[in-house]
Amino acid sequence: MKKMDYQNVRGTQDYLPEQEVTRRAIRRTLEDTFMAYGCKPLETPILNYTELMASKYAGGAEILQEMYTLTDRGERDLALRYDLTIPFAKVVAMNPAISMPFKRYEIGKVFRDGPIKAGRFREFTQCDVDIVGVASQAAEAELMMMAIDAFDKLNLQINIQYNNRKLLVGLLQLFEVEQEQMNRVILILDKMEKIDQKTMLTELQELGISSNSINKIKQFLEERTQINMAYFNEYANENMLLQQGLQELMELTAYLNTLELSEQCIFNPFLARGLEIYTGTIYEIFLADEIIRSSIGSGGRYDQAIGGLLGSEQSYATVGISFGLDVIYTALELSGKIERNTPIADIYIIPIGTEKAALKLAAELRRKEYKVEVELSGKKVKKAMEKANRENTQKVIVLGEDEVTHNMYKIKEMQSGKEELVAFEF
């Protein structure tokens, strides 16, 4: 018989208990923060129709190339979700009775057949919050504040860079970039931190962008150190879309100043976020210490997606933010901020021929909300105590027949060595 290949699929991994304890603690911290902001939990299917995930309101051509697709026995074209945004938009589209504004969070696995790097896998856990029904920049400000709160609780300091898609598109319109080339140009600009300016300009030439437009883009890039929000005032009267984007940015900045978040939330006029789904504010989250240089979270406003899925022109004011749980874990690990050997059980009971009595005692202790493990494999006391020390268990009970006969047990605090005799009716 051929030996089975026990390796994990490339881009996937197992999380052993020591890792999973930390991952679940991260998840609880995020969930507690999300709920503190009034967000409601939601769960959506991993498996979706390809048509939904590939719609023009979905992830764009670059992500669609990474989509896992399959055909079921009914020959239906299906896909594994690559994010939580489109499944959420589908839920809102299918449930018109949902009360607005609707704030939801979802933490779940998503799949992308993309490149693998630190904290980036092909099966990974995404943590999303989205708000439907708030047109003002108050929604963006609250999500950015929530992100800072969440990462503070995780002992990670972050910066959030933000921009506005309308500002960027309006500027490119003034640079005479053709509408059908717009998103491909934005995708190239989105790679600014990864490629040099010469390579970027070459890619624009290969795309067929006119030399006039390229020269204007080049000048814009060369002035990057001098560009702030006021820079765009002179263009505001020349392009309505740019004007709207600038107004939204000023509104958001006013909120951030009031919330005293302006030091951590930084306007970046070159932030592009190449996904076509975005219609307004966009932002990306970075670690302040740059222990991971790529973004660890992102989001933005996508007012057309829900209406688009419904096949209507109606706009649904929607904005979201997303964090990767796996990259958060990697950041904590690289920063040395993960507590190792966290005990699972509060009390470890070692029976010496008294398994039935040990299970009865454990049941009573659990009713008192202790986490209790009973040694059931027949380990000798010495080996069992070594396990208790190795797993950093706080308290141990060695339960022999004499203790059961006398209706008492001795509980030992492992750190101090202190022992206490406790009566119990076996």
Regions found by a protein language model. Give the residues of each.
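Polyanion/phosphate-binding surface patch
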Residues: 46-78
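Auxiliary tRNA-acceptor-end handling modules of aminoacyl-tRNA synthetases
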Residues: 1-20
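Acidic, His- and aromatic-enriched active-site or binding-groove loops in soluble protein domains
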Residues: 63-72, 177-199, 287
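Generic N-terminal leader/targeting and pre-domain segments
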Residues: 3, 28-38, 43, 58
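Short, conserved phosphate-binding/catalytic loop or strand-edge motifs used
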Residues: 121-127, 162-170
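Hydrophobic mid-domain F-helix/FG-region of cytochrome P450s
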Residues: 148-153, 167-176
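Acidic carboxylate-rich catalytic motifs and surrounding loops in phosphoryl-/glycosyl-chemistry enzymes
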Residues: 45-46, 161-166, 268
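Positively charged, Gly/Ser-enriched RNA/tRNA-binding surfaces
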Residues: 22-37, 48-49, 65, 75, ...
